[in-house]
Curated annotation (Swiss-Prot):
Catalyzes the formation of the alpha-1,6-glucosidic linkages in glycogen by scission of a 1,4-alpha-linked oligosaccharide from growing alpha-1,4-glucan chains and the subsequent attachment of the oligosaccharide to the alpha-1,6 position. One of its GO terms (biological process) is glycogen biosynthetic process. Its EC number is 2.4.1.18. This is 1,4-alpha-glucan branching enzyme GlgB 2. It comes from Rhizobium johnstonii (strain DSM 114642 / LMG 32736 / 3841) (Rhizobium leguminosarum bv. viciae). Monomer. The active site is at D415, E468. Belongs to the glycosyl hydrolase 13 family. GlgB subfamily. Keywords: Carbohydrate metabolism, Glycogen biosynthesis, Glycogen metabolism, Glycosyltransferase, Plasmid, Transferase.
Length: 736
C-alpha cells in the first residue's frame, strides 16, 4: 500500500477495515463520512460496485476533489481543506448519482426517545423507529431506525443500494440497542428491509421492518417507506361527537367482516375489492342494514392469507392486499361519514415464525421467549410475545395506539386473550413454567392488559377495547383500579355455545335442554358482554348458521329467524358475521365470497330484511339497550316453560319509561291463547314477529293486544298471545 493510501486510511486498523469490507463493522461512522486528520478533512465512502466518486460543492456543484481508491473492495477517500457542505457524485456502470453523504449527519434520535423506547413507554413508536420520510438541514430523505440490541451489525437495504448490506450500515445507539441511519434523497414508496449480522457473526435473512407503516402485498415481504403527509380527514363531526360511554349505553350492533371475502370481482380474476371499492359497496350496505359498527378481521400485514389475518407480522401497517395506508384511512373516513364505527381485530398474543419477520430478529429471542414452554404456541405453531420485556410491551401498546390515533379507529377487539392469561393454556403437565408464585396465571399478561387499557382510555377516551376471552377469568371488564383487566366489553362465548347447541337440536329434544337458554342470565351482568355469532362458528366444517338449523327447509329458515330475533332481544350487544344476515347456505370460505346470489330467493331476502328491522328496533328502543349492561333493565317473563319450549323476556328503559316483551316459541307447534303476565295494563303493540310473511313466515300475527285482569306469572294483568311456530315476537308496552 502506498503512502497516499495509508494516509487515507489513517487511524483505521486492519481488523476494522476488514470488518467494514466483510459487512461486520458495528460502528461505520468511525470510518465513513468526514474525519479530521492533521488539519485536513478526510471523507470516506464505501460503495462496492462504483466506478468513480467525486466530492462536489453542495452549492455550486463544482468538483472539489476526486475520491481515490482506498481499498479495491469499494472504499473511496478524498482529502479536502475544510469540512464544508458537500455532495457525492457517484459513477455507477449504468448511471451517475448525485447525493448527500449519509455518514455526514450527526446523531438522529434524541436521548429522551431512546430512554422511552428502553422503558417501554414510547407510545408514538412509528414516529421514531421504522422509516420516517423527513428533512434534515433542508435535505429530504428517510431516517431509518430499528431495535436490535444483540446485533453486531445492521444495514438498511433496498432497491436504492441493490439490496447490498455493505453499502448502508447503521449507527448503534447503545443505550437503547437502536440502530439509525438517514439516507438522503429517498422518498416514500421505496422498498426496504434490514440486514442483520448477529452476535456470532452470522448474516441473518433480511428482515422486514417491525414498525413499517406500509408493506408489499403478500407474497412479497419488503417494507415500504410510507408517506409522512397527514391524511386529510373529513370526520371531525364524528370524532367530536363519539363517546365511549354513549356507545356502551346505546345500541351496539356489529357486522363482522373478512375484507378479502366479503365480495369478489368475478369479472377481474375473482379478486378481492380494494379499500376504495369497499367504501363504495360495503359501507353503504352496512349502514343501510342498520348496524352501528363494522368489525374487520385483522387487516395488519400478515404473510399467510389462510390465517385470516390472525398471524400478523406488520403490526403498524395495513395489509397491502387492499391498497395503500391512505386508501385504508379513506375507508375509515367513509365509514364515519356514514355513521359507522370501525373496530379492528388486533393480535398481541403471538406471531408467525417466518424467517424475515420477528422471529429471532437480531439472532436472539428478542420479541419472543427463549424457552419454548413460554415462547411457542403449539396450537398455531407461532411464537409468543415476551411480555416481561419493556420494549416488547411498548411495541405492542404503540401498535394499538397507532390504529386508534393515526387511523381514527373506534375500538380494538383483542384476540386470544385467554391464551395470554394462562401459562398452561393448551399445554400438558411439564410443558409450561409456573409463575413466581407457582401458579398458572400469566402475571405479565395481566399487567400488560391493565396497562394497555389504562393507556388507551387515557389517550383515546373515545375508544373501546373488547376482549375475546373464553374462560371465567374474573373482572375482565372491571377497571384496573378495581382489580380488573380494564376492557370495555367481553365476548360472551358461553352464551354463544349454549344457544347454538340448543337451536341445533330437533325441537322434540329442546325441552330437555331448556336450561341452556336461561343459564346465561345467571352471569349476564358479571361482565359487560357482547353476544358473538362470529366467523369461528361458520367455518372448519361447522357449516353455516342456516345449515345448523334442524328440520326441512321451511323449518330451517324459521328456526334461524327465531334464533336471530331471540339474540337481538337478549341482553348484550350484538355481533353477526357477514353472510349470516342473508342465511348463506354454505360455510365461510376465505378464498371465496359471500353467496350474494341467494338473494334471488325470497326466503333469504326475508332473513336479510329481518336483521335490518331488528337493528332498527334495537336502535330506536331504549328498552332494548338499557338492559344490555344493567340488570334493572331485564326480567324473565317466562323462564320455566320447558314443556312448551317457550321463553319470555321483559326489557325496560331507564326508570321503566318504556318496556318491550320478547317471546320465543322454539317448537313447530303454534301456541294459541298463550297467557303471559305483563307489568303494565293497556295495549301492547306487536313490533316484530319473525313469522311475518315479509320475512318468509306463515303470517300468524298478534297486532295490538289488550291486557286482561287475569293474574299470571306473579303479575296482576296478562296478555293472551298467539305464538307462531318457531318464532320470536316483540311487543311494545303501553306508555306509563
Amino acid at each position: 500500500m502506498n503512502v497516499e493510501r495509508s494516509e487515507l486510511l489513517a487511524g483505521i486498523g486492519q481488523d476494522a477495515l476488514w470488518a467494514l469490507i466483510e459487512g461486520r463493522h458495528g460502528d461505520p461512522f468511525s470510518i465513513l463520512g468526514p474525519h479530521q486528520s492533521g488539519g485536513m478533512t478526510i471523507v470516506r465512502v464505501y460503495l462496492p460496485g462504483a466506478e468513480a466518486v467525486d466530492l462536489i460543492d453542495a452549492t455550486s456543484g463544482r468538483v472539489v476533489a476526486p475520491f481515490s481508491i482506498a481499498h479495491p473492495s469499494g472504499l473511496f477517500a478524498a482529502t479536502v481543506a475544510s469540512r464544508t457542505g458537500y455532495r457525492l457524485r457517484i459513477t455507477w456502470p449504468d448511471a451517475v448519482q448525485i447525493t448527500e453523504d449519509p455518514y455526514s449527519f450527526g446523531l438522529l434520535l434524541g436521548e429522551l426517545d431512546l430512554h422511552l423506547i428502553s422503558e417501554g413507554t414510547h407510545y408514538s413508536l412509528s414516529r421514531t423507529l421504522g422509516a420516517v420520510a423527513m428533512s434534515i438541514d433542508g435535505i429530504s430523505g428517510v431516517r431509518f431506525a430499528v431495535w436490535a440490541p444483540n446485533a453486531r451489525r445492521v444495514s438498511v437495504v433496498g432497491d436504492f443500494n441493490a439490496w447490498d448490506g455493505r453499502r448502508n450500515p447503521m449507527r448503534l445507539r447503545p443505550s437503547a440497542g437502536v440502530w439509525e441511519l438517514f439516507i438522503p434523497r429517498l422518498a416514500p414508496g421505496e422498498r426496504y428491509k434490514f440486514e442483520i449480522v448477529d452476535a456470532e457473526g452470522t448474516c441473518l435473512p433480511q428482515k422486514a421492518d417491525p414498525v413499517a407503516r406500509a408493506s408489499e402485498a403478500a407474497p412479497s415481504t419488503a417494507s415500504i417507506v410510507a408517506s409522512s403527509t397527514p391524511f386529510r380527514w373529513t370526520d371531525d363531526g364524528w370524532m367530536k361527537g363519539r363517546s365511549r360511554q354513549d356507545r356502551l349505553e346505546g345500541a351496539f350492533s356489529v357486522y363482522e367482516v373478512h375484507v378479502g371475502s366479503w365480495l369478489r370481482d368475478q369479472k377481474d380474476g375473482n379478486r378481492s375489492l380494494d379499500w376504495v371499492e369497499l367504501s363504495q359497496r360495503l359501507v353503504p350496505y352496512v349502514s343501510d342494514m342498520g348496524f352501528t359498527h363494522i368489525e374487520l378481521l385483522p387487516i395488519m400485514e400478515h404473510p399467510f392469507g389462510g390465517s385470516w389475518g390472525y398471524q400478523p407480522l406488520g403490526l403498524f401497517a395495513p395489509t397491502g392486499r387492499y391498497g395503500t395506508p391512505e386508501d385504508f384511512a379513506y375507508f375509515v373516513d367513509r365509514c364515519h361519514g356514514a355513521g359507522l364505527g370501525v373496530i379492528l381485530d388486533w393480535v398481541p398474543a403471538h406471531f408467525p415464525t417466518d424467517v424475515w419477520g420477528l422471529a429471532r430478529f437480531d439472532g436472539s429471542a428478542l420479541y419472543e421467549h427463549e424457552d419454548p414452554r413460554e415462547g411457542f404456541h403449539r396450537d398455531w405453531n407461532t411464537l409468543i410475545y415476551n411480555l416481561g420485556r419493556n420494549e416488547v410491551k411498548g411495541f405492542l401498546i404503540a401498535s394499538a395506539l397507532e390504529w386508534l390515533e393515526r387511523y381514527h379507529i373506534d375500538g380494538l377487539r383483542v384476540d386470544a386473550v385467554a391464551s395470554m392469561l394462562y401459562r398452561d393454556y393448551s399445554r400438558n403437565e411439564g410443558e409450561w413454567i409456573p409463575n413466581q408464585y407457582g401458579g398458572r396465571e400469566n402475571l405479565e399478561a395481566v399487567e400488560f392488559f391493565k396497562h394497555l387499557n389504562s393507556i388507551i382510555h387515557e389517550r383515546c377516551p373515545h375508544a373501546m377495547t373488547i376482549a375475546e376471552e373464553s374462560t371465567a377469568w374474573p373482572g375482565v371488564t372491571k377497571p384496573p383500579e378495581q382489580g380488573g383487566l380494564g376492557f370495555d366489553i367481553k365476548w360472551n362465548m358461553g352464551w354463544m355455545h349454549d344457544s347454538l347447541s340448543y337451536i341445533e337440536k330437533d325441537p322434540i329434544y329442546r325441552s330437555y335442554a331448556h336450561g341452556t337458554m336461561t343459564f346465561g342470565m345467571i352471569y349476564a351482568y358479571s361482565e359487560r358482554f357482547i353476544l358473538p355469532i362470529s366467523h369461528d362458528e361458520v367455518v372448519y366444517g361447522k357449516g353455516s348458521l342456516l345449515t345448523k338449523m334442524p328440520g326441512d327447509e321451511w323449518q330451517k329458515f324459521a328456526n334461524l329467524r327465531s334464533y336471530l330475533a331471540f339474540m337481538w332481544g337478549h341482553p348484550g350487544k350484538k355481533l353477526l358475521f357477514m353472510g349470516s344476515e342473508i342465511a348463506q347456505p354454505s360455510e365461510w370460505n376465505h378464498d371465496g365470497s359471500v353467496t350474494w346470489d341467494v338473494l334471488d330467493q325470497p326466503q333469504h331476502v326475508g332473513i336479510q330484511r329481518l336483521v335490518k328491522d331488528l337493528n332498527g328496533l334495537y336502535g330506536d328502543e331504549p328498552a332494548l339497550q338499557f338492559g344490555d349492561f344493567h340488570s334493572e333493565g331485564f326480567e324473565w317473563a317466562a323462564a320455566d316453560d320447558a314443556v312448551n319450549s317457550v321463553l319470555g323476556m321483559l326489557r325496560y328503559a331507564p326508570d321503566r319509561a318504556s318496556s318491550v316483551l320478547v317471546m320465543s316459541n322454539f317448537t313447530p307447534v303454534p301456541r294459541y291463547g298463550y297467557r303471559i303476565g305483563v307489568p303494565s295494563d293497556g295495549v301492547w303493540i306487536e313490533r316484530i314477529t319473525t313469522d311475518a310473511r315479509e320475512y318468509g313466515g306463515s303470517g300468524l300475527v298478534n297486532g295490538a293486544v289488550s291486557s286482561e285482569p287475569v293474574p299470571a306469572h306473579g303479575r296482576p294483568v296478562s296478555l293472551s298471545l298467539t305464538l307462531p311456530p318457531l318464532s320470536t315476537i316483540f311487543l311494545q308496552g303501553p306508555s306509563p
